[in-house]
From Swiss-Prot:
Antimicrobial peptide. It comes from Pseudopleuronectes americanus. It is found in: Secreted. Pfam families: Antimicrobial12. InterPro entries: Antimicrobial12 (IPR012515). GO terms for biological process: defense response to bacterium. This is Pleurocidin-like peptide WF4.
Length: 68
């Protein structure tokens, strides 16, 4: 019961604090900035793998017959 009451009080406190107080705005701004970089890194990593797979699919096409 104590844990629940403490959790609720902390939750209410966090909701009531304005973004300008205690540097919350700065923390949220840096968090958004970090999330944006992580998202871009994930997309770039996925696209790099996709290009490798596309290249491999063209190089290893089983329908192409090559006589050497």
């Amino acid at each position: 019961m104590k844990f629940t009451a403490t959790f609720l009080m902390m939750f209410i406190f966090v909701l009531m604090v304005e973004p300008g107080e205690c540097g919350w705005g700065s923390i949220f701004k840096h968090g958004r900035h970090a999330a944006k970089h992580i998202g871009h890194a994930a997309v770039n990593h996925y696209l790099g793998e996709q290009q490798d797979l596309d290249k491999r699919a063209v190089d290893e096409d089983p329908n192409v017959i090559v006589f050497e």
